[in-house]
């Protein structure tokens, strides 16, 4: 029947040139194309003015004409923690040269910086900006080793052609620096990533310079909660990746914390804590409330002891003192496997630790828990407060600080009491951080005076009522 119908209409069928051309074109593709999917182009609905295209990135693909909208770029170079550029338009990223091209439709869009370009802290007429996308801006000890990324405002003729299109935004940042230090992993990478990407609900791709593969394995649960896509090793990337939106650099507000007034959706550290609870399936959102619990149930106290310096020399005495005031106590060196460490910490109501990266585990404590930081000798009080004193309060937890005396420091076994190490640490601070780190963080252990420390334990117990 189908053949008969064709035959009936055959006299007029080939009188239409457009139809004839279509049939010939299809036959040509079937006969001569090795694989039709090599030329696949998928169009999806996008934001008005920014057509969304996902193109097969094979090298046999022939570049299609690209609509170039007016570029929008906002860079902030005045923040004291990090430089960040956010852009929208036709964006092309070439990893092997660490370049991000924001394409303008004409020279007129570029001259004078362009109407959609807003860069604070730099020349308003600039068309090229250099960023080290790591959140320790100004630190001479680490920033020279951070890969520099260049953002360029160019015309289409100056930009490399696209090899691969993406329908989600990109975030470009460095995984170098202090990567591997537990505190810096959260402070320099994870929390800034949360601030910069969480509002995108996983629809974002991370383009990472100095990518440490093991790091993404260690924090897999967190990374997969922030992006649905495999993070890209940008330094090894040979293709030109194209996006409609991109951010170069990460937003960072303060040490181990978030300023909700500056964060998308007013995200706070409470939101970050709940994010961690979700990613690690932590059961306890709130610490014990002793007045509401069975009176036979004791609050649990975790004493974190360090493997190297700044250890508790008299750990047994500290545990006995805490048990004496009413805590159920455990002393531990936490598992390096993050899910196991997170689960363990979440089961406690209070934590005691000497200033150091172990205190970073406070992010896994339930809300209303108590954090006790023991501050070693050497005028470390300000640093201790910034790094581990403010964050607990921002996470709806309680914070207590115990500053040790010279008698409680093992430095008294190394230096005479009349030494400047005890009498005047300030010149040592002014001389160099390396010297401070060597003496006060690298040579010192702690022998707590448990009688002097007992009121702090009682205060912690009171805060849990």
Swiss-Prot record:
Glycosylation, residue list: 80, 118, 125, 266, 403
Molecular-function annotations in GO: UDP-xylosyltransferase activity
Keywords of this entry: Cell wall biogenesis/degradation, Glycoprotein, Glycosyltransferase, Golgi apparatus, Membrane, Signal-anchor, Transferase, Transmembrane, Transmembrane helix
Pfam families registered for this protein in UniProt: Glyco_transf_61 (PF04577)
Transmembrane segments: 12-32
Topological domains annotated Cytoplasmic: 1-11
Subcellular location: Golgi apparatus membrane
Cited InterPro entries: Glyco_transf_61_cat, Glycosyltransferase_61
Tissues/organs with expression: Widely expressed.
Protein's pathway: Glycan metabolism
Family to which this protein belongs: Belongs to the glycosyltransferase 61 family.
The protein's role, per its UniProt record: Glycosyltransferase involved in the xylosylation of xylan, the major hemicellulose (non-cellulosic component) of primary and secondary walls of angiosperms. Possesses beta-1,2-xylosyltransferase activity, transferring xylose from UDP-xylose to the xylan backbone. Catalyzes the addition of 2-O-xylosyl side chains to the xylan backbone.
Name of the protein in its database record: Beta-1,2-xylosyltransferase XYXT1
Species: Oryza sativa subsp. japonica (Rice)
Gene: XYXT1
